[in-house]
Amino acid sequence: MGMDKKLNYQKLKKLATDLGVAAFGVCDFTEKKDLNSAVSIAIRLSKSVLDEIEDRPTKLYFHHYRQANGLLDQIAMRISNFIQFDGYNALPVPASQIVDWEKQTAYLSHKKIAELAGIGWPGRSNLIVHPEFGSQIRLATILTDMPLSTDRPLKKDCGKCKRCIEVCPAAAIKESQKDFDHIICFEKLKFFQKQRYADQYICGICVKACNGK
């Protein structure tokens, strides 16, 4: 069984990498008894697109954000189909399916799955920080009952880096990630959306600031 788990892991990781995934990890999942593994995938955002952001989201970033989510959904679907052809069950969770915008919650937390799967650690900005790419990534998750080896969470943090705190237009980011102010953040997102800077509740300023350690 151990060899099967390792082989399955290697097959999925190769497929994901071939499809353009920049980071891949697996963790145990206990919230659904019939799907006990969670596969976390991440793709990189365009640095050139992010460089266009100054003090507000841009139309270009808004479209790029949607493109990234669409690509992740396609990749997650292809990985899920691969798993099903192998005789197992798979549930691709959309990259951006918000249940509550104000609390910034979804069907499940891609960020928590990514943390447990060793993709990165929770940053002060409430985003996952990848060791190389920082927070300039987007995430998706595939739940499955395929036997898979698992990864370990990274034992790292943001250290002395406070770039996201310095640039946050809402002052929502604090010294501790646990003190991140969701309400103030969302109020600023609503302002940006009302001003039609972007047709969705997004910002991108802290994403641009967090470009890896």
Question: What annotation goes with each model-predicted range?
Answer:
Residues 1-74:
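Non-catalytic, usually N-terminal nucleic-acid engagement modules in DNA/RNA processing proteins
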Residues 67-213:
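Catalytic cores of enzyme domains
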